[in-house]
């Protein structure tokens, strides 16, 4: 319980550091854009990362208690392949069509809507990291090794502050999106945890095929969504929704083998 509480404390420190860095930019609306951008990114992250990881925890705990480490590794690998293959194209498609939806949903002026849009896009770069981190943390909790997520969040905190401060020092005119991008520290933390986990299980967790398919789907889906939203005449909101829908559909054949793994989780 102690390491878990300290880990949660570390996560809260990151939130505090985020708002402090935003105050250093002197940018009007920086804190607000970070809050809205994070909230938007959390919608797919909660529906995918949190939901899958929460459902998997009892299974992982059972495998760990029975020393079924091969099944434990395969369950993690399947979950990662699903999350990686889904979240990379989802992030690209959302980034392509998000701007008119932000303006319609929140009613801010053009400048504030643009700031929220770019901050959201920066957060969407970290969507995969947030999602796979849900699996990483629960993998160690299932093994009753909560100390490793604690070590990892310390590394994440240091990286976030370092990247964020370096970013606003060099690119202060960009402001909040740079701070949102600093959450890439979470992806680094997740990779760190999975490398650590692989070494403790003596078998590597292999997900490169899902990464490749996700990247290809992201390019095709994102470009499709953007072109449809930009060039089809009509309401900006409707064309953005149409572009995102069709962009998502064209991704499906590319990542279909990973999607089918949902039935095996």
Region spans (language model):
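Membrane-interface helix-loop junctions in multi-pass transport and translocation proteins
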Residues: 147, 157-194, 223, 227-245
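Helix-terminus/linker motif at the lipid-water interface of multi-pass membrane proteins
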Residues: 9-43, 59-63, 99-111, 233
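Transmembrane alpha-helical segments of multi-pass transport proteins
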Residues: 209-262
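Membrane-interface junctions at transmembrane-helix termini in multi-pass inner-membrane proteins
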Residues: 125-155, 172
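Interfacial segments at transmembrane-helix termini and the short loops linking adjacent helices
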Residues: 95-127
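Interfacial transmembrane-helix starts/ends
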Residues: 35, 56, 64, 68-97, ...
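Alpha-helical transmembrane segments
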Residues: 136-144, 193-210
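Helix-loop junctions and terminal segments of transmembrane helices
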Residues: 49-67, 137
């Amino acid at each position: 319980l102690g390491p878990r509480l300290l880990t949660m404390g570390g996560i809260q420190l990151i939130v505090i550091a985020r708002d402090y860095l935003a105050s250093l930019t002197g940018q009007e609306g920086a804190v607000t854009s970070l809050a809205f951008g994070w909230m938007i990114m959390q919608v797919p992250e909660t529906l995918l990362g949190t939901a899958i990881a929460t459902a998997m925890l009892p299974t992982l705990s059972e495998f760990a208690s029975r020393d079924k480490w091969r099944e434990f590794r395969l369950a993690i690998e399947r979950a990662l392949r699903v999350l990686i293959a889904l979240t990379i194209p989802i992030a690209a498609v959302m980034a392509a069509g998000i701007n008119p939806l932000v303006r319609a949903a929140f009613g801010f002026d053009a400048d504030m809507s643009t700031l929220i849009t770019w901050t959201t896009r920066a957060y969407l770069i970290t969507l995969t990291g947030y999602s796979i981190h849900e699996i990483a943390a629960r993998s160690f909790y299932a093994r009753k090794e909560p100390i490793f997520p604690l070590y990892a969040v310390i590394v994440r905190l240091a990286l976030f502050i370092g990247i964020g401060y370096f970013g606003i020092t060099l690119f202060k005119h960009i402001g909040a999106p740079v701070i949102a991008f600093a959450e890439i520290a979470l992806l680094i933390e997740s990779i760190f945890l999975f490398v650590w986990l692989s070494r403790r299980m003596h078998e590597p967790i292999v997900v490169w095929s899902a990464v490749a398919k996700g990247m290809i789907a992201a390019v095709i889906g994102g470009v499709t969504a953007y072109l449809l939203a930009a060039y089809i005449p009509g309401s900006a909101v409707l064309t953005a929704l149409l572009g995102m829908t069709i962009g998502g559909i064209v991704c499906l054949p590319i990542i279909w083998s990973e999607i089918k793994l949902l039935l095996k989780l």
